[in-house]
Curated annotation (Swiss-Prot):
Propeptide: 1-112
Domain notes: The similarity among the IL-1 precursors suggests that the amino ends of these proteins serve some as yet undefined function.
Taxonomy, superkingdom: Eukaryota
Protein name: Interleukin-1 alpha
Description of post-translational modifications: Acetylated within its nuclear localization sequence, which impacts subcellular localization.
Family the UniProt entry places it in: Belongs to the IL-1 family.
Organism from which the protein derives: Macaca fascicularis
Keywords assigned by UniProt, alphabetized: Acetylation, Cytokine, Cytoplasm, Glycoprotein, Inflammatory response, Mitogen, Nucleus, Phosphoprotein, Pyrogen, Secreted
């Protein structure tokens, strides 16, 4: 009787034969943190405690696939749980992660939690104030105003003197120069916008001066500022899937999108 090929053994042999190649591509190395660096929920009983994560692999010696092309997660019975093809010159980015998560042709392994610790654990250094005394309007032409000493809200107003005026301070990080982290301060005060969890109101917190360095738990004061035409978005650094948002008859909060409004128009020179 013909011997049934052991696919998992082939995978191990392929990796062993190409160990020297893997050392030249550290960002795909098994010595580095896994591309899927999250805690996964329980798999089917037949696969529990049997899955392995390979950063790079060939499927078998006879497959003729090049060593550089694939990234897979397989179980010991040879079932491919998740895969993504990459070239050696392709860096792993947030877009890679998002594309994999949204690809309907791939089997999704849902995590219990997937914190963006690589963002919140960075150190951010203050550069300078880049905008002074601007107003934020949402797409319903509501203006952000003070609800009380601690919270903000949005309302249709006729007198712009009621509007909150913000200053925007820019920060930088040596590890990621593709985003623009900013801090939002109520003009002529030392009150700073601070993020909480989803659907929780943003807070106004007082600090003696603008922080020169922000890291760890203090990243709730930072937001990635993105612009698309006249639309402006403020994405929480502490919660990178949540935006500053307005909601009907509610405080300004953090939200993923509708029914909350996450895009704003910046009105400058309103002093």
């Amino acid at each position: 009787m013909a011997k049934v090929p052991d696919m998992f053994e082939d995978l191990k042999n392929c990796y062993s034969e190409n160990e020297e190649v893997s050392s030249s591509i550290d960002h795909l190395s098994l010595n580095q943190k896994s591309f899927y660096d999250v805690s996964y929920g329980p798999l089917h009983e037949g696969c529990m405690d049997q899955s392995v994560s390979l950063s790079i692999s060939e499927i078998s010696k006879t497959s003729k696939l090049t060593f550089k092309q694939s990234m897979v997660v397989v179980s010991t019975n040879g079932k491919v749980l998740k895969k993504r093809r990459l070239s050696l010159s392709q860096s792993i980015t947030d877009n890679n992660l998002e594309a994999i998560a949204n690809d309907s042709e791939e089997e999704i392994i849902k995590p219990r939690s997937a914190p963006f610790s690589f963002l919140s654990n960075m150190t951010y250094h203050f550069i300078r104030i880049i905008k002074h005394e601007f107003i934020l309007n949402d797409t319903l032409n509501q203006t952000i105003i003070r609800a009380n000493d601690q919270y903000l809200t949005a309302a249709a107003i006729h007198n712009l003197d009621e509007a909150v005026k913000f200053d925007m301070g820019a920060y930088t990080s040596s590890k990621d120069d593709t985003k623009v982290p900013v801090i939002l301060r109520i003009s002529k005060t030392q009150l700073y916008v601070s993020a909480q969890d989803e659907d929780q109101p943003v807070l106004l917190k007082e600090m003696p001066e603008i922080p020169k360095t922000i890291t760890g738990s203090e990243t709730n004061f930072l937001f990635f500022w993105e612009t698309h035409g006249t639309k402006n978005y403020f994405i929480s650094v502490a919660h990178p899937n949540l935006f500053i948002a307005t909601k009907h008859d509610n405080w300004v909060c953090l939200a993923k999108g509708l029914p909350s409004i996450t895009d704003f128009q910046i009105l400058e020179n309103q002093a």
